[in-house]
Amino acid sequence: MAQRPFTKVTPALQQAMQAFSQNDHLRAIHLCDTCLQANLHDVNAWHLKGRCLTAGGLYDLARKHLKNALVLKPNEPSILASLGRLEIELGNAEAALTALNQALQLQPSFPEASLEKGKLLERMGEYESARKCFESINSASPFRDDAEYSLAQLHFHAGAFSEAVEQAEKLMARTDDQSTVYRKTAFVQGRALDKLKKFDQAMAAWKKGNANFQTNFDPNEYASRVDAYMKVYAEETVQNLPRSSCQSLKPVFIVGMPRSGTTLVEQILGAHNQVLSAGELRHIEILAQSLPDLIQSKSSMPDCMTGIQADLLDQVAIRHLKELEDLNQDQCLRVVNKSLENYWFVGLLHQMYPMAKFIFVRRNPFDNALSVFSNWFNPHKYSYTYTTELKSIGFVYRQVERLMQHWTNLLPEHILHVEYEALLGDPERESRKMVDHLGLEWDPNCLQFHKSDRLVLTLSYAQVNRPIYRSSQDRWKPYEKHLGELEEALGHHDR
């Protein structure tokens, strides 16, 4: 590739940038492709497409695009910062820090790079260095709510709960109560108040964070979707559905509700010397979206699956294995994908990989639902439209249970149920069960998962960086008087 970059912002690139700002990553990618077809040296198109692919979870492809952008413009701080963000997503702390430091050496007053570096250092437990990054942003520029929010979160994770509440109150007082930063800050404030045992105030803060969202969550539509998967993959028809000839044991899928303990399970398995924890890969979700076109079906998922052929399953299985191998530099025997949405696709995944194993993580429904309600999930994303109301969270909990019980009835040898509370109570016993389920020999490193140098990005990162703890068990009890609609939504579930 020639070294001279094309840096003009074309109309197509302007449209791509607008689509990216609106989180319409697929449209942005198509527009970037249009730019690159017109001029292969368009550094901005390579860069933006790399950012879109990062946001979409296609990390290896994203890295290739960002590296192409760097070939064209080697000392561009914004590209280096994007590469740093990609490495953070992959859990590669050292590579991320290198890229971000390079960006800041080239442009010391680069707030976006300082912000990413601060968040990275926080996740690494280097709280004082992280604080300096955030404060440097505020000293070099006017009030930036993202830096102020990061300071509040830093105080919380450092155990300075009163300071976290104070920082959150200061930020919320100067931001619009409908803004994303206000809502995210309210969740931090609530969690800090919870640690201070000010439970009513904590619940009030979480309600502020969840208030007045106009989401499109439709419980009837959600239940109908579950029904559709259970119909296509009914017990009397599933044996007649085609399967690929792929006999690989490499893909492993962890599924469950958000905040159910899936990150802990992933970290335990990832500490095994023959297991790679790949994080929340979106490859299968993206594949599922494309299947109707690949099958040339007018029906959407899952109805289109009645028309799929074994040769297409072979193709997509091999392609996905190649994507896993691109991440699997250490040639591990198992690669774990913990994208929670995969509970929809257990049937598809079994067709692709008839030998693959699944782990379904379950948690006490009251603890699980409260944990979802008390954390920020973007409710404008389809996956999380239910997270702003306790009754909706309870409803989805029951639907996930219903669908996973169906998959388990169909594939009892392939799906292991892990109870979060049992894992806390006897980590070695439950960890041995999981390792045995994957067909591997026991590795005592699984009990030392908190010593891993892999970066954890999910909301659970502060918890899984230390040994097993039980403070998250029965967390709902001080909030019992606030959980009436949740109890009604959960129906028969025991506490």
What are these regions (language model features)?
Residues F345:
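Long C-terminal interaction/binding lobes of large macromolecular proteins
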Residues R282-H283, P365-N368, L423-L424:
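Conserved nucleotide-binding/hydrolysis micro-motifs of P-loop NTPases
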Residues S162-M172, D176, T185-S248, D303-T306, ...:
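PAPS-dependent sulfotransferases, especially Golgi type II membrane carbohydrate sulfotransferases
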Residues S290-S297, S371-P379:
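Short, flexible, mixed-charge acidic loops at enzyme active sites
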Residues L349-V372:
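Conserved phosphate-donor/acceptor-positioning beta-strand/loop module used by diverse small-molecule
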Residues H320, S339-N342:
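Active-site glycine/GP-rich loop and adjacent strand/helix microenvironment
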